[in-house]
A protein has these predicted regions:
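Conserved pre-motif I regulatory segment
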Residues: 1-24
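Short hydrophobic/aromatic beta-strand immediately N-terminal to the Walker A/P-loop
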Residues: 21-24, 49, 139, 210-212
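Conserved SF1/SF2 helicase motif Ia
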Residues: 24-26, 34-60, 133-135
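Motif I (Walker A/P-loop) of helicase-class P-loop NTPases
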Residues: 30-40, 121-126
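Conserved C-terminal RecA-like helicase domain
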Residues: 49-52, 56-62, 66-74, 212-271
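Inter-Walker segment of RecA-like/P-loop motor cores
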Residues: 59, 64-104, 166-171, 176-179
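SF2 helicase catalytic motif II
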Residues: 92-95, 99-139
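Conserved interdomain linker/interface between the two RecA-like ATPase lobes of SF2 helicase motors
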Residues: 113, 127-131, 136-139, 144-225, ...
């Protein structure tokens, strides 16, 4: 059983008082637990719609909560299943029309709400939040919004009873460095910025390494470049079942201890 921290208890308490809650906490601190506590371990007191930015995240949440035996549905544009479940995982765009027309849930959770400032998707987020029915409580979650208090003030100007809950302690300390600070001298055969950077970081014992790419194609291309360039003295051995699960292309790359991850992969491959 997870014992919630004080800030998580404060957020849940505010929700139970009927307030909108804007949570600002670092990645991994436990923002999702606020909703899970409100949901009473899968037995929520009303209808909840938990929105996430991508279909991949929606599928992950669906699988996670269903594995606990929770009654969960999903709506992501390409998939609509069990829409009347007490908990619905969705992309926000699939819910926008319902919210604007006053058909909102008891609680709308917007995970990674910093997308309100996104050039392409921000308008949908802003409209959904601004026009959500007053009977729908809002729970906004993020760790990368510079001015969460401004968001609270904006919600209050809309006539909503909103509060901010902040937690600044990172579960894992964050350290920053620059490629020039890495001391490892590269073999001449390693070419390209990212293969060189990864080789240096691994030599300085900074692995595992996670690199974010802007598009699916970039993700696979970058992974191939790194896999081809890095020395591989200890190939990863995969079973026949594992190779069949992820497919030949990704399996071959995994043997070099390099992989890619995006929404185009099956849930089993991503897991």
């Amino acid at each position: 059983m997870t014992v919630p921290d004080l800030w998580q208890q404060q957020a849940v308490g505010a929700l139970r008082e009927g307030k909108d809650v804007v949570v600002h906490a670092p990645t991994g601190a436990g923002k999702t637990l606020v909703f899970e506590l409100w949901a009473n371990l899968g037995k929520p007191r009303g209808k909840a719609v938990y929105t996430v930015p991508t279909r991949a995240l929606a599928n992950d949440k669906l699988a996670e909560w269903r594995a606990r035996g929770w009654p969960v549905g999903i709506s992501t544009g390409d998939i609509s299943e069990n829409l009347d479940a007490p908990i619905l995982v969705a992309t926000l765009e699939t819910q926008k029309s319902r919210l604007i027309h006053g058909d909102g849930p008891d609680l709308l959770i917007v995970d990674e709400y910093q997308l309100i400032g996104d050039r392409d998707r921000g308008l949908n987020y802003e409209l959904a939040l601004a026009l959500a029915p007053s009977k729908t409580q809002l729970l906004l979650l993020s760790g990368s919004v510079a001015n969460p208090d401004h968001v609270v003030k904006w919600l209050r100007r809309l006539g909503r009873d909103a509060v901010s809950v902040k937690h600044t302690v990172r579960p894992v300390p964050l350290e920053e460095t620059f490629p020039d600070n890495l001391s490892y001298k590269l073999p001449r055969e390693i070419r390209g910025y990212w293969p060189k950077f990864v080789a240096k970081a691994l030599a300085d014992d900074l692995g595992p390494i996670l690199i974010f790419a802007p598009r699916r194609a970039n993700t696979e291309k970058l992974a191939r470049q790194i896999a081809q360039q890095l020395p591989n003295p200890d190939p990863l051995k995969l079973s026949a079942a594992q190779k069949n699960l992820v497919g030949g292309h990704l399996a071959k790359m995994l043997e070099t201890r390099v992989a890619y991850h995006h929404s185009g992969l099956s849930f089993a491959a991503r897991a």
